[in-house]
Amino acid sequence: MTAKLIDGKAIAASLRQQIAKRVAERSQQGLRTPGLAVILVGSDPASQVYVSHKRKDCEEVGFISQAYDLPAETTQVALTNLIDRLNEDAAVDGILLQLPLPAHLDASLLLERIRPDKDVDGFHPYNVGRLAQRIPLLRPCTPKGIIALLESTGVDLYGLDAVVVGASNIVGRPMAMELLLAGCTVTVTHRFTKDLAGHVSRADLVVVAAGKPGLVKGEWIKPGAIVIDVGINRQDDGKLVGDVVYETALPRAGWITPVPGGVGPMTRACLLENTLYAAETLHD
């Protein structure tokens, strides 16, 4: 048996087409164009690449993209003032603060400063709390995108034993809440977990978001399980690999996401979807 690939690139492209169609319809109806403000502080190369992709995505679907490229020495006060200004700008439906930030800045305070109805990354405590209360509003982009990938398989998630490897605020914790909403029985593992292999080997569905290349071995995968690899790690030879040993997981899994081309494109597409939702549902 060889796993079926979950093509995040194709699914994300389809979602972007749907968003672009809706933006065009809004224009024909005389409604304003959704706007996304993207804030980049400093010159981290990976962040610069991510931000350029997000701006290109905005252009593709017809959004207005406001770019704020700030020097690394930007102060907490200056950044807070910018966020306050964007919060009050009626042309801005979403505010994206690219992480990580330089060490002297308090990311938690800045993310909380973004108005919850413009928090299209879904990181604000209000939006995370809504998800925990089972009344999601703006959902964290990566877990939201993963749910869309899982739905594309047609597999019924109700009652599945799911294991999330990694407990970050960005992926692991909100992912566990999304899977609970989807009807799974969820185990969250982390750096202190004993017998990670045992947990993974019992799982019908594994979501790996640890940021450690090759952490999950192919032989751990339960035959027929769904494997979602969120990790994206660059090796010394320049090759991008995930947190799962893909080559040995492929013959055991039922479904698997490739790296790259799996989760990453869906994260970006869901950012656009959240921005459109904010424009239409929260701001119009």
Swiss-Prot record:
GO biological process, one term: L-histidine biosynthetic process
Pathway assignment: One-carbon metabolism; tetrahydrofolate interconversion
CDD domains named among the record's database cross-references: NAD_bind_m-THF_DH_Cyclohyd
Superkingdom of the organism of origin: Bacteria
Statement: the UniProt record of this protein carries the keyword Membrane: no
Binding site residues for NADP(+): 166-168, 232
Matches recorded under SUPFAM superfamilies: Aminoacid dehydrogenase-like, N-terminal domain, NAD(P)-binding Rossmann-fold domains
Catalytic activity: (6R)-5,10-methylene-5,6,7,8-tetrahydrofolate + NADP(+) = (6R)-5,10-methenyltetrahydrofolate + NADPH; (6R)-5,10-methenyltetrahydrofolate + H2O = (6R)-10-formyltetrahydrofolate + H(+)
Classification via InterPro entries: Aminoacid_DH-like_N_sf (IPR046346), NAD(P)-bd_dom_sf (IPR036291), THF_DH/CycHdrlase (IPR000672), THF_DH/CycHdrlase_cat_dom (IPR020630), THF_DH/CycHdrlase_NAD-bd_dom (IPR020631)
GO cellular component: cytosol
Keywords: Amino-acid biosynthesis, Histidine biosynthesis, Hydrolase, Methionine biosynthesis, Multifunctional enzyme, NADP, One-carbon metabolism, Oxidoreductase, Purine biosynthesis
EC number of this enzyme: 1.5.1.5, 3.5.4.9
Function: Catalyzes the oxidation of 5,10-methylenetetrahydrofolate to 5,10-methenyltetrahydrofolate and then the hydrolysis of 5,10-methenyltetrahydrofolate to 10-formyltetrahydrofolate.
Similarity remark: Belongs to the tetrahydrofolate dehydrogenase/cyclohydrolase family.
Subunit structure: Homodimer.
PANTHER family in the record: C-1-TETRAHYDROFOLATE SYNTHASE, CYTOPLASMIC, C-1-TETRAHYDROFOLATE SYNTHASE, CYTOPLASMIC-RELATED
Protein's name according to its UniProt entry: Bifunctional protein FolD 1
Organism of this sequence: Pseudomonas syringae pv. tomato (strain ATCC BAA-871 / DC3000)
Classification of source organism: Bacteria, Pseudomonadati, Pseudomonadota, Gammaproteobacteria, Pseudomonadales
